[in-house]
Amino acid sequence: MTKQTIIAAIAFLASYSLQAQKHVYEDLLVLYVDEKYEKCMEKALTYTEGDATKKDPLPFLYVSMCNYEMSKLEKYAADYPKASRDALKWAEKYRKKDKEKEFFGNYEDYWASLNTMAAESGENLIDDPKGLSKAKATFDAMTGYYPENPGAWMMLAIVQYKSNLAKEGDLSMTSFDKAIAAAGDISTLPPDQKKLLKNALIRYADLQVAKGDRAKARRYAEIGKDVFMEEPDFKGMWDSL
């Protein structure tokens, strides 16, 4: 597929939503598709500060996407050491601008990639007492840009409980309960969200067992038993309850 075809396809997907904004950010799209991430980000940042464009969601999203792409490339590591963190930060800012999710669904592939990166980063930190603060920031950001993702809420609650923030953990579990109810059939969740949910259910069960509340561990584990029982780590947890 040629670059021109890719640009046309992406522009078509977003065309209905773009009509609602004063500015059509074809300049950002072209730079992004051409992999000129630094230039694209710098230009998007000017839009986020301009009086006529600072309320538009898309420039904030482009800043996030460019940071994400730069976080994967060694040539940007020295100048942008916090690119992965900034990708999450700007994704949150984008979502605050796009409260009605006018553009959100056009970027499902990006959300899956960002979720995967964030979840792996957060889980790598969650078992290290020195990493809890960063893990908390990561999962908090995930719930900020994608509050419909139930596993992110449960992971955030787990980190908060581990950090002796019981009240905050309880609030996050309330948000998890709402998100899981709204999700409906969890087998239809995107793969990245299913994986995070499975891992969160296992960790939450382990946490409750350590507290001596095996009944609560089993009650929440039941959420995933019809979907995850074929996976050894989940089955091992279930059999231990």
Residue ranges of model-derived segments:
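Bacterial Sec-dependent N-terminal signal peptides
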Residues: 1-29
